[in-house]
Amino acid sequence: MTGPQQGKILLRLENVSREFITGEQTVRVLNNINLTLHSGEMVAIVGTSGSGKSTLMNILGCLDKPSAGEYWVAGRIPQYLGSDALAELRREHFGFIFQRYHLLNDLSARENVEIPAIYAGIDREERRKRAVNLLSRIGLAERLDYRPSQLSGGQQQRVSIARALMNGGDVILADEPTGALDTHSGNEVLNILKDLHQQGHTVVIVTHDMSIAEHAQRIIELKDGEIIADRPRDHAQEKPKMVDIPSVIDIPSMDEKISTGAQQETEIARKPLLTRWKVQYDRLHEAFKMAILAMAAQRLRTALTMLGIIIGIASVVSVVALGKGSQQQVLANINAMGTSTLEIFPGKDFGDMRSAAIHTLRDTDADVLAQQGYIHSVTPTVSTSVTLRYGNKSVSGTVNGVGEQYFLVRGYTIAQGMAFTRTSVNDLMQEAVIDENTRDKLFPNGETPLGKVILLGSLPCRVIGVAAKKQSGFGSDENLNVWIPYTTAMKRMLGQSYLKSITVRVNDDIDLANAEQGVIKLLSQRHGTQDFFVMNTDSIRQTIQATTSTMTLLVSMIAVISLIVGGIGVMNIMLVSVTERTKEIGVRMAVGARASDIMQQFLIEAVLVCLLGGSLGVALSLGIGLLFSLFSSNFSMVYSAASIITAFVCSSLIGVIFGFFPAKRAAEMDPIRALERE
């Protein structure tokens, strides 16, 4: 059946049926519908509840597809189109007016009206100007920034009408537009719809009220899914007096727009790159805005969701910083022993019971080693514990007999005075270099120790220098040390001709392992056997570095588990969010959002939650590091840009990975089911 032709055929249904499966039953809601709508008509589809009128409207608006038969929109068949093409049809050619308005509560009236234009890629300033123009012309100029909760029912429905017109609204589909309004507001809405019809819009009103249907020029009655009447209205209603809406949008015919619709993606692709990036940026900006609004609406839930991410990121960053700090501390301790050094001891290894009886390490060995080209410096070493005295002060300390190159080998700095020389060693001079701890104990009142004579046991020695304090993890920093020429210690104190150890510093350009083999070979030849062992500081360094890295990795893996738990929490909350915002998803799809737009919005929300959690986690870790430094002066957590950047990358990945399933679920929603969700 057809009504009076007012323009070209716009919408046509042939033998259209729609069935739904409920349990094991198949329910036919529409049965062999044949209907043609022309451009510029004002049609009312009227019927009781369950007659199929809303299902018919959903098919007309490309929200649903027929189970059988065919539906044409200006020559195109929607049921054969993909979801993006259907979204484009809804976005560019249809405007929906719902009984319950379906406005987004977190957006203002203007922002609600702008939504279809966002998905159409319209410039921000242009769509804002258009939204203001539309709202002003329907009497809401003073309420542009009002939220839906601040508007009356009639005002909310006007906002819904403005939203339907945002992209042109060639076909206005109004589902019970006055059902939730009082009589006065309902008449205002009907007058607006009639005025839009006079401007050339095709208006389809779905209602159960025949008095509402009487305002249309053509009435189609449905009963039990079939058209039982299709009659024109021969007498025209009075021209509406409530509002006058000049053509607020330059509307080409739908036939013209549809004919070029297939070329739209190509045209977009041909736009300048800057323009395409601007459109994409605009969509991302709006998605970020909606994500922030959604997070702000559920502050406590958002905070609890982020808690797992905060703890996980803080744990990972802190563990890495602790590992880095401990590694640097250990390396500093090893460097305190001297860089690129070899320590030569009698015996086979530490703890060798026979080492005390081996007296083959001699000062001549040190002299021969010093002549090797790959060796930078050498110092023999002997030591003993004695009582140190000056005046009436006496303390226990260690006397170290060393060579003149000892301070160079060990990397010590002379803070006061000077170190002894080769002449001091050769002449068995009774000269001493003390450390700062010894100076503070024997000369507590700031008296200069230089030139003073102290007793090392029973041996008097003149202080010629003070060595600066040096941190070392191998022995207490509070030890009292005195250094004298090793010849003086051996002859005047110990009465021995053998050494406790020899320390060798290798040239920086020489591989320490090769130098170690050279030393072993040389001394073995001199001794006739290998009755000594060599401690390579680089080997210790590498072992400690490997151990530290392994422990850091192990603890990091434990921290990563908390990140995964946090990610699962994000996914859980995002699923809840998708369920709570089902109607919003339906509205966005109805006004033209593609599946990718919906997915993008929820992915951005998940990533934003994780990034914010990651930022707070990094801040928490830095705070822990600050507190740590306040209570520990000898050790600090070392943060690196790489670890912080990695933390943010991990946060983003968690958002993408654990937000993907909820976002996909949202994108795959049926718009009809979403709109019907209470």
Swiss-Prot record:
Binding site for ATP: G47, T48, S49, G50, S51, G52, K53, S54
EC number(s) given by UniProt: 7.6.2.-
GO biological process terms held by the UniProt record: response to antibiotic
Domain of life: Bacteria
PROSITE patterns for this protein: ABC_TRANSPORTER_1, ABC_TRANSPORTER_2, MACB
Membrane topology: Multi-pass membrane protein
Domain ABC transporter: 11-249
Pfam families noted in UniProt: ABC_tran, FtsX, MacB_PCD
Keywords: Antibiotic resistance, ATP-binding, Cell inner membrane, Cell membrane, Membrane, Nucleotide-binding, Translocase, Transmembrane, Transmembrane helix, Transport
Primary location: membrane
GO MF annotation terms: ATP binding; ATP hydrolysis activity; transmembrane transporter activity
Cellular location(s): Cell inner membrane
GO cellular component: plasma membrane
Task performed by this protein: Part of the tripartite efflux system MacAB-TolC. MacB is a non-canonical ABC transporter that contains transmembrane domains (TMD), which form a pore in the inner membrane, and an ATP-binding domain (NBD), which is responsible for energy generation. Confers resistance against macrolides.
Family listed: Belongs to the ABC transporter superfamily. Macrolide exporter (TC 3.A.1.122) family.
Subunit structure: Homodimer. Part of the tripartite efflux system MacAB-TolC, which is composed of an inner membrane transporter, MacB, a periplasmic membrane fusion protein, MacA, and an outer membrane component, TolC. The complex forms a large protein conduit and can translocate molecules across both the inner and outer membranes. Interacts with MacA.
Protein name: Macrolide export ATP-binding/permease protein MacB 2
Protein's organism: Yersinia pseudotuberculosis serotype I (strain IP32953)
Lineage start: Bacteria, Pseudomonadati, Pseudomonadota, Gammaproteobacteria, Enterobacterales
Name of the coding gene: macB2
